UniProtKB/Swiss-Prot annotation:
Ig-like C2-type domain segment(s): 24-109, 110-199, 251-365, 368-464, 469-559
InterPro entries recorded: Ig-like_dom, Ig-like_dom_sf, Ig-like_fold, Ig_I-set, Ig_sub, Ig_sub2, Ig_V-set, Kinase-like_dom_sf
Record-given protein name: Tyrosine-protein kinase-like otk
Keyword line: Cell adhesion, Cell membrane, Disulfide bond, Glycoprotein, Immunoglobulin domain, Membrane, Neurogenesis, Phosphoprotein, Receptor, Repeat, Signal, Transmembrane, Transmembrane helix
Signal peptide residues on this chain, from the entry's feature table: 1-23
Function noted in UniProt: Acts as a calcium-dependent, homophilic cell adhesion molecule that regulates neural recognition during the development of the nervous system. Component of the repulsive Plexin signaling response to regulate motor axon guidance at the embryonic stage. Also component of a receptor complex that is required in the adult visual system to innervate the lamina layer; specific targeting of R1-R6 axons.
Basic and acidic residues: bias regions: 723-734
Family matches, as Pfam families: I-set, Ig_3, PK_Tyr_Ser-Thr
Organism ancestry: Eukaryota, Metazoa, Ecdysozoa, Arthropoda, Hexapoda
A single MF term (Gene Ontology): cell adhesion molecule binding
Gene: otk
Native organism: Drosophila persimilis
């Protein structure tokens, strides 16, 4: 049936192409299609028409207006490309217009609609609440194109479904006859192709019904004063009223003498302290007492006061929001209960309350205090200069300012009387400068002023009125000439500023320097003249005109006939010959197209049958083996992995080329791919069961997903070690059989299905709840691990970075580099499981020893590291990085935050890369990528070139962090943009830390030399550190 439909459509196409006359035979081989694109992603509209008699010129219209091309929106041949789609500018209808250069006939394609998919925020709205029903709505700021938004509801941490008295309908949640079992915090999540967001604030529901008494657990001890007939009243998570009523009040001699009462007004950037003076009786010294600080009802910081074992968790807080992440600005002093802020930011504003919690008793609360922050007056973002198109209907320049109180924004024009704005220029209530019917007199400098009680700030922008370049005399072709003749190609343009004209041949620029000056002449008006034409001059010539308003291009074909052919334009056959030639060409193209389509259909059918046969054979083999492959067990074959490599390693021993056209620059810039003779791919050999993980705790978010700390069964750790040993043995055996110069046959490639990418991969609460906790007696049989989830399965850049980190760590076996235990890929999201230590990352350890992190249980901060200890840490990291270099790999993000340290003072190079929250201050978005610009060498920022020498540069910054105890950032007096500018200009100066030994200063300074070849190697650094440790030990 499909073959018949295809044959009929091809016949119709052939008959259309062979009809005489372009007006009647005009048609589009390819028309632009409507599409929905995620904001900031690229969009492409295809357009291709046919005209047998002449060449065609293409134009594009957006909402009825001709498109002005620039660096973001430009034309590739006849197709339209939009680099980063913006919903405010690019939404609408797009039409392709094809014009015949011979007859001047024009034809327009059907309009194609572009819809932008975006997702900003979600919130829970209460529509109705009474005894009979509870009705909530999930309000979402976003759009999903033709696909509906996916809404999910959660009560506390449990996902809800339509069952029992709970009904879900589109964006609404209805609970009929609510009871105490329905109490809790209700939140919603919305997801589409642009991502997934959760409502920042939910709705807390608590039924006005007393909780039912239940029998106590067996052998549970209670005070004798409570009496024999005692029942336990269990409340729902998220509601504290019922639980507090079931607990006895706190002892009277346990008091909070002074709390954070009143209102505290602090300027942004200043320090602040909230007091909580308490009295702790002697008889309660050994009791479990916890001092807590809450902000807006949410737990912020806590510390143990009594001498008993610290309380690992409390059921009363299990339903609350998660604790704030580690923040060096906040310090809770155990001695007096004071909560101090090193530097106030705007988000610190809120209501604060301190609390004493004695186990078995209701919490003792202080009076609440209000902290208000005076936000500094600033522009968000800074206004920028702009080019406006002449006669544009509307043009806008934004100016937004923030501060306390809210500032007033005003625009002024320099050089005019009273600094007034010209006609048809106005300012709206948001501070946006609006130009209507842009004219030449609107050109000039404009100043945006923001005023408040804090003072005044201003920013000046330059407004330039430009005219898009247009062809006054476009090149016309094709041009046919004889050898040794003369050809003149006209190309003249108008615009403001005056456009420049550039000629190219076959996409290679032409100039007086790369052409024969005796034959090629570039006239002042843009005309190109070629004298004594040669056969090699034949080709496609393009004329590009451009100014600050945009670029335009026209192509012309030059055909050179040899004098031996007896060609003369006036002696060619009449119109009959041209028509016959056009018909023959059309029939040949149509026939070739039909043959190609039929061949592709047969080839695809053969590939499907071959793939099905391979999968069946693999399933049979794996079913009889000791360890079935995860892809076969999953029932979906190896096509389940859209983000991992689609090819298996061959046995040739040759490295594979990198994807996305990113050429391999040197041995230092990419990991060499080691060959394996195993039938399984390298990723299948890393498979770990997801059930082997337990007690996952999220510690942050990285570039491609969430990052957790958890535990892995010791049996799986041993199996992973044995697998690595077997792989090395197999590799040695393969090398002994094939020899160094031998080459084996490569394994077949496996096509991977992308059905999983129809939904957005995200780490959900259900995935974490599937990993059940182990019994306490099994904790000794578990290994602490770091788990990195791949959530962005549709982001090719994130998938490529995930594969790069896998290839980096799987090929290294060294005590100075963390182990890669395996890969959980039974379902999305994939988990990368790495070795972790009991003391965590090195930066937090350095901050703790410097007294910058609240240790909670300790009476005082740990002592600072000695010089010999710092040198030992630097030496271990240098050994680990030397192992990475010998594996022909690069790290690309070496810093103390990406190293881990154990209680045995063993330091290893790792890769947590928590760039989205915990260490977001140490990364900066440059060229649409988050980069640690303060640790990067100049060649990494300018040319995106990563080598071992760039890792040497980062290692020098790491040693600087070690001797400064990681208490400050490199060049913290500069902004990230200033660091980038000075690094590119070569004016960024580096100095070693004051505590650095004299013997190391010279080699550490050489790590930051501008020429990468002059920087030392890791082996040289290790030798220098070893000598420095010996000299320090002798002293």
């Amino acid at each position: 049936m499909d073959m018949d439909v295809m044959m009929i459509s091809m016949c119709i196409l052939a008959s259309t192409l062979m009809a005489p006359g372009w007006a009647s035979t005009s048609g589009f081989l390819r028309v632009p299609q409507s599409q929905s694109i995620v904001e900031n992603e690229a969009a492409d509209f295809g357009c291709e028409a046919t005209d047998p008699a002449s060449y065609l010129h293409y134009e594009w219209l957006h909402n009825g207006r001709e498109i002005s091309y620039d660096k973001r929106v430009y034309r590739i041949g006849s197709h339209l490309h939009i680099e980063a789609v913006q919903r405010e500018e690019d939404v609408g209808d797009y039409v392709c217009i094809a014009t015949s250069l011979a007859s001047g006939a024009r034809e327009a394609s059907p309009p194609a609609k572009l819809s932008v998919i975006y997702l900003e925020s979600a919130s829970v709205q209460l529509l109705g609440s009474n005894r009979n029903e509870l009705l909530l709505k999930c309000h979402v700021e976003g759009a999903s194109g033709d696909e509906p938004l996916q809404i999910e509801w959660y009560r506390d941490s449990a996902r809800l479904a339509s069952w029992g008295n709970v009904h879900l309908e589109e964006h609404r949640l209805l609970v009929r006859q609510p009871s105490p079992s329905d109490d809790g915090l209700y939140r919603c999540t919305a997801s589409n192709a642009a991502g997934r967001v959760m409502s920042k604030q939910g709705y807390v529901y608590q039924a006005n019904i007393k909780c039912l008494p239940r029998l106590l657990k067996k052998n549970q001890k209670l005070p004798e004063s409570w009496g024999k007939q005692t029942f336990l009243c269990r409340g729902k998570r998220g509601g504290s009223g019922g639980l507090d009523q079931a607990l006895s009040p706190a002892p009277e001699d346990l008091r909070i003498v002074q709390g954070p009462a009143g209102q505290l007004l602090i300027k942004e950037g200043d320090s602040a302290a909230l007091s909580c003076l308490y009295e702790l009786p002697a008889e309660l010294q050994n009791q479990r007492i916890q001092l807590r600080w809450r902000k807006d009802g949410k737990l912020l910081r806590h510390v143990e006061l009594g001498g008993a074992i610290p309380i690992p968790g409390h059921a009363h807080d299990s339903g609350k929001d998660a604790l704030l992440r580690e923040d060096a600005r906040l310090v809770l002093h155990k001695q007096n209960g004071t909560l101090s802020f090193a530097s106030i930011i705007a988000s610190d504003a809120g209501q604060y309350q301190c609390q004493l919690q004695l186990e078995g008793h209701a919490p003792l609360n202080s009076s609440p205090g209000l902290l208000e922050v005076i936000e500094q007056l600033k522009f968000v973002p800074q206004p920028t200069s702009k080019n406006l198109e002449l006669d544009a209907a509307v043009a806008k320049v934004h100016c937004k300012a923030q501060g306390t109180p809210s500032p007033q924004v005003q625009w002024l024009r320099e050089g005019s009387l009273n600094s007034s704005l010209p006609d048809q220029v106005e300012v709206d209530i948001n501070g946006t400068l609006i130009f209507r019917n842009v004219r030449a007199e609107h050109r000039g400098n404009y100043t945006c002023q923001a005023r408040s009680s804090q003072g005044q700030i201003s920013a000046t922008v330059s407004i330039n009125v430009v005219v898009t370049p247009k062809f006054s005399v476009p090149p016309v072709g094709p041009i046919e000439t004889t050898e040794q003749g003369t050809v003149v190609m006209h190309c003249q343009a108008i615009g403001d500023p005056k456009p420049t004209i550039q000629w190219d041949k076959d996409l290679k620029y032409l100039s007086e320097n790369n052409t024969d000056r005796e034959r090629f002449s570039f006239l002042e008006n843009g005309t190109l003249e070629i004298r004594n034409v040669q056969v090699e001059d034949e080709g496609s010539y393009g004329c590009t005109i451009g100014n600050s308003a945009g670029l335009k291009r026209e192509d012309v074909q030059l055909v050179v006939r040899s004098t031996g052919d007896g060609f003369a334009p006036e002696e060619t056959g009449g119109d009959g010959f041209l028509v016959t030639r056009a018909v023959l060409i059309t029939m040949t193209v149509a026939l070739a197209y039909i043959v190609l389509v039929v061949g592709l259909m047969l080839w695809c059918r053969y590939r499907r049958q071959a793939r099905k046969a391979r999968l069946n054979e693999l399933s049979i083999k794996e079913a009889g083996g000791d360890q079935p492959d995860a892809s076969v067990t999953n029932g979906k074959g190896s096509e389940q992995e859209p983000c991992l490599s689609k090819q298996r390693n061959g046995a040739s021993g040759k490295p594979k080329s990198k994807s996305n056209g990113d050429a391999q620059k040197s041995d230092d810039t990419a990991c060499s791919q080691q060959s394996r003779s195993s039938k399984k791919s390298v990723y299948e050999q890393l498979v770990l069961p997801r059930s082997g993980l337990s007690e996952l705790l999220q510690i942050g978010r990285g570039e491609f997903g969430d990052v957790f700390v958890g535990k892995l069964k010791a049996s799986l750790v041993a199996a992973s070690a044995q697998s690595d040993k077997d792989a090395d043995t197999e590799k040695q055996h393969s090398n002994s059989e094939n020899g160094s110069g031998g080459s084996g046959s490569g394994s077949g490639s496996t096509t991977l299905s992308t059905l999983n990418e129809k939904r957005r991969s995200k780490t959900s609460m259900d995935d974490i709840e599937e990993i059940k906790e182990e019994e306490p007696e099994q904790s000794a049989l578990e290994q602490l691990v770091l788990v990195k989830a791949l959530n962005k399965v549709k982001d090719e850049q994130a998938c490529q970075e995930f594969r790069r980190q896998l290839d980096l760590l799987r090929g290294i076996s060294h005590k100075g580099v963390v182990r890669l235990f395996g890969l959980c890929r039974e379902k999305d999201p994939h988990y990368m499981v790495l070795e972790y230590t009991d003391w965590g990352d090195l930066k937090q350890f350095l901050l703790a020893t410097a007294g910058k992190v609240n240790t909670a249980t300790a009476t005082s901060s740990p002592p600072a590291l000695t010089t010999s200890q710092v040198l030992a840490v630097a030496y271990q990291i240098a050994r680990g990085m030397d192992a990475i270099y010998r594996s022909r790999c690069t790290h690309r993000d070496l810093a103390t935050r990406n190293c881990v340290i154990s209680s045995e003072f063993v330091v290893k190079v790792s890769y947590p890369a928590l760039c989205k929250d915990k260490y977001s201050r140490e990364y900066h978005k440059h060229r649409n990528t988050l980069l640690p610009v303060r640790w990067l060498a100049p060649e990494c920022i300018q040319e995106d070139e990563y080598t071992t020498k760039s890792d040497i540069f980062a290692y020098g910054v790491l040693v600087w962090e070690l001797f400064n105890q990681a208490t400050k950032l490199p060049h913290e007096e500069l902004t990230s943009e200033q660091v980038i500018q000075r690094s590119q200009a070569g004016t960024l100066e580096w100095t070693v830390a004051e505590a650095t030994p004299d013997s190391l200063k010279e080699i550490l300074l050489s790590c930051w030399l501008a020429n990468p070849k002059e920087r030392p190697s890791f082996s040289q650094l290790g030798s220098a550190l070893s000598k420095a440790m010996q000299s320090v030990a002798e002293k």
